[in-house]
């Protein structure tokens, strides 16, 4: 069952490989990613785990593409002489016969003339299905060849992985992703920004939450300066998904060891550290086999005074077992999430494929008819609040128009104040002008109407502005509808629908504006002084009288009760010399010379201090203007939105389908309108590929 779990992830890796590998796959698979500097011994650790020399070697960047290494434990046939430890206590069977040992030392397993049944371990590449590599030197050459095929021979790098599966009775079932080694300085013809390129690639792999980071670090250098560990801590600062490997333990200075690191007293990691010993360059040149190196590693830890008591927690065999255990545990934890993610992603691409439409296109006429019908229905639905997808984040469609009506427009109307333009002197002047040559005995209706009509005209600007705002909102709905993928399929038709819709709105805006202006003119034309909500003139005069002459109630000093009011015995006001309409134009000096009459100035204004009567009349008119203006505000705030609903909004909802059919359906260029977008064609191919891959992935995980 445990091996089946890892095998399932291996199959998923292969299934998702066409998507560009682990860094670009939409599914975050649990995997162990191997990071470290070029000099950390990363490749040697992997070869020790496999028990074979198969990775490219050389100077500079050797690993230039991620290598997804899938190790499959293959039980040997009964006829084979090799004794394999099935309990996984040993990684490599050291009792292999002499003939096999000689083959290992030579590094050659010839494929020619030998049947598959005679071989116990081999490699297979995903890009070469069905071909088995028994010669591990050939595996190395194929890795180099496939790397150069994508990156070229100029030491460039690529994030597209190479998938290699190795079957052997001498390995534990395990999956590792070998990433390019970190480097500081470009060598040879490497790009000048090679350090940044490698770091960016590694971060794409190890940043994924389901990635276990295997950080390979040289023990004979300061751990705090380890490139691999520093990179791991960028994405995993707490060390919760990082395991450390300490190489070159045998090369440390005399009297030093890694006990403090192993105990977690330096840089603690959740999975801890495991010390190993690799072959040096001299060992490789002298053809020292990996089996011999593993035996030397075992003896080193068993005999070293610092490690002998913990030798069974050191070395490559323990590293392989621990990685196997970590990966299995990680897979068990993440598998439900992976299943859900695969199903959700599959559904997403299936829906997109449906929106993109099938490859076999219907007749041009039926396509145009279908698109116009869909557009008209969706437009009406958005206006009425019946859209398929209602947002919970922001207002849209008809709700935005309602906001424009009842918030934006109403606030604009309410903010109009007639007295920010009308001054008391203006009222005084109009009162005298409206009375003509004979002074008026009462507050003039003419002055009131003149002033009110002037102020009603001010409602025209915000009302016409409302037409523009509603126009913009309807265009916004248009853009919301045609932004859907199904409209992107036919860009010419989408553009035609958009243009015709906007032109329709522009045409409808003209009579709408005229209607709005007529409504304002109607309010100006007839001032309804009999309106039931209008303040009566007598009420206004009483209010002004109380304001100008507040009555003081006498109080009985003995009882504290108000005394009865005495009837007023006021006399007619005495007109002072300086009061009156013309008082401001003539000084006292001129009054004495009335015999010498002069012509009035060309521009004659009502100036000077107002009389008590003028003050009262002015205040009365102001009260009446304020009262009537409030009535007009309510009327305008109510009737103008209704006018727009009639002339623009409802008209567009009921007439747009008919207009679009008249303009677009059955025209000569209808074939051009239904020509598919190249982007749509390409996207459909991509979605079909994704659906196929994800269906395969879904079938793989459904068996677990």
UniProtKB/Swiss-Prot annotation:
Record region (G5 motif): 277-280
Residues covered by the Dynamin-type G domain:
26-336
PANTHER family under this entry?
DYNAMIN, VACUOLAR PROTEIN SORTING-ASSOCIATED PROTEIN 1
Stretch list, region G3 motif:
178-181
Write down the species: Saccharomyces cerevisiae (strain ATCC 204508 / S288c) (Baker's yeast)
Taxonomically, the superkingdom here is Eukaryota
List each copy of the GED domain by range: 618-704
Any one GO cellular component localisation term in the record: cytoplasm
Q: Mention one GO biological process in which this protein takes part, according to its record.
A: mitochondrial fission
| Keyword Heme included in the entry's annotation | no
What CDD domains does this protein's entry cite?
A: DLP_1
Chain residue ranges for the region called Disordered:
76-122
Name it: Vacuolar protein sorting-associated protein 1
* Annotated region (G1 motif), positions in chain: 36-43
User: Which family is this protein grouped under?
Assistant: Belongs to the TRAFAC class dynamin-like GTPase superfamily. Dynamin/Fzo/YdjA family.
- Give me the stretches of Basic and acidic residues compositional bias: 98-122
- Give positions of region: G2 motif: 62-64
Alphabetized Pfam families for the sequence: Dynamin_M, Dynamin_N, GED
Q: Give the sites modified to Phosphoserine.
A: 579, 599
Q: Which residues bind GTP?
A: 36-43, 178-182, 247-250
General remark: Present with 5960 molecules/cell in log phase SD medium.
What functional role does this protein have?
Answer: Essential for protein sorting in meiotic cell division of S.cerevisiae; it binds microtubules. Could also be involved in microtubule-associated motility. Necessary for membrane protein retention in a late Golgi compartment. Interacts with the MVP1 protein.
Organism classification, top ranks?
Eukaryota, Fungi, Dikarya, Ascomycota, Saccharomycotina
The record's region (G4 motif) falls at 247-250
Where does the record say this protein resides?
Cytoplasm, Cytoskeleton
């Amino acid at each position: 069952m445990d091996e089946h779990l890892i095998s399932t992830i291996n199959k998923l890796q292969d299934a998702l490989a066409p998507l560009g590998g682990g860094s670009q796959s939409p599914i975050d698979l649990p995997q162990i990613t191997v990071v470290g500097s070029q000099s950390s011994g990363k490749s040697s650790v992997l070869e020790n785990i496999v028990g074979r020399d198969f990775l490219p070697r050389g100077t500079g960047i050797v690993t230039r593409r991620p290598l997804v290494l899938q190790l499959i434990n293959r039980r040997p046939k009964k006829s084979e002489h090799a004794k394999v430890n099935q309990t996984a206590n040993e990684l490599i069977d050291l009792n292999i016969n002499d003939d096999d040992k000689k083959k290992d030392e030579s590094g050659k397993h010839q494929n020619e003339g030998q049947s598959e049944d005679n071989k116990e371990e081999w490699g297979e590449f995903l890009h070469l299905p069905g071909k088995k590599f028994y010669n591990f030197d050939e595996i190395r050459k194929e890795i180099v060849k496939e790397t150069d095929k994508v990156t070229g021979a100029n030491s460039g790098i690529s994030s597209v992985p190479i998938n290699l599966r190795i079957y052997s009775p001498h390995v534990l079932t395990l999956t590792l992703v070998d990433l390019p080694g970190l480097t500081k300085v470009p060598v040879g013809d490497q790009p000048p920004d090679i350090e940044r390129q490698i770091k960016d690639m590694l971060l794409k792999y190890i940043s994924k939450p389901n990635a276990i980071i295997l950080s390979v670090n040289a023990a004979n250098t300061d751990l705090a300066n380890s490139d691999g560990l520093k990179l791991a801590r960028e994405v995993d600062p707490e060390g919760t998904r990082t395991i450390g490997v300490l190489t070159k333990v045998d090369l440390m200075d005399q009297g030093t060891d890694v006990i403090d690191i192993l105990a977690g007293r330096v840089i603690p990691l959740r999975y801890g550290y495991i010390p190993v010993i690799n072959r040096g360059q001299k060992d490789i040149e002298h053809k020292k086999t990996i089996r011999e190196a593993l035996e030397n590693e075992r003896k080193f830890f068993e005999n070293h005074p610092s490690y002998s008591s913990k030798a069974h927690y050191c070395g490559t065999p323990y590293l392989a077992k621990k990685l196997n255990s970590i990966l299995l545990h990680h897979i068990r934890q993440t598998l439900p999430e992976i299943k859900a993610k695969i199903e959700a992603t599959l559904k997403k691409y299936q829906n997109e494929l449906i929106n993109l439409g099938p490859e076999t296109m219907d007749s041009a006429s039926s396509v145009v008819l279908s698109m116009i019908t869909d557009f008209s229905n969706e437009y009406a639905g958005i206006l009425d609040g019946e859209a398929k997808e209602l947002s919970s984040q922001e207002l849209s469609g008809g709700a935005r128009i309602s906001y424009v009506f009842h918030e934006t427009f109403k606030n604009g109307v309410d903010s109009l104040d007639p007295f920010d333009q009308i001054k008391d002197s203006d009222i005084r002047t109009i009162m005298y002008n409206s009375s003509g040559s004979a002074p008026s005995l009462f507050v003039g209706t003419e002055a009131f109407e003149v002033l009110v009509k002037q102020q009603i005209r001010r409602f025209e600007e915000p009302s016409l502005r409302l037409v523009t705002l509603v126009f913009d909102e309807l265009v916004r709905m248009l853009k919301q509808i045609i932004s859907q993928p199904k409209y992107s399929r036919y860009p010419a038709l989408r553009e035609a629908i958009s243009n015709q819709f906007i032109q329709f709105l522009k045409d409808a805006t003209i009579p709408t504006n005229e209607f709005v202006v007529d409504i304002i003119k109607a309010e100006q034309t007839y001032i309804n002084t009999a309106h039931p909500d209008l303040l009566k003139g007598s009420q206004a005069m009483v209010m002004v009288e109380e304001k100008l002459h507040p009555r003081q109630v006498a109080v009985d000093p003995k009882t504290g009760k108000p005394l009865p009011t005495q009837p007023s015995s006021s006399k007619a006001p005495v007109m002072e010399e300086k009061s009156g309409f013309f008082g401001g134009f003539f000084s006292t000096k001129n009054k004495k010379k009335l015999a010498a009459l002069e012509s009035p100035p060309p521009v004659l204004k009502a100036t000077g201090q107002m009389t008590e009567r003028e003050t009262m009349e002015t205040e009365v008119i102001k009260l009446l203007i304020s009262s009537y203006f409030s009535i007009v505000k309510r009327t305008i705030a109510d009737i103008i939105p209704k006018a727009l609903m009639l002339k623009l909004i409802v008209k567009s909802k009921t007439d747009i389908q008919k207009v679009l059919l008249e303009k677009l359906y059955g025209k000569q260029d209808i074939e051009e309108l239904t020509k598919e977008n190249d982007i749509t064609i390409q996207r459909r191919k991509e979605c079909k590929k994704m659906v196929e891959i994800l269906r395969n992935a879904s079938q793989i995980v459904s068996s677990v």
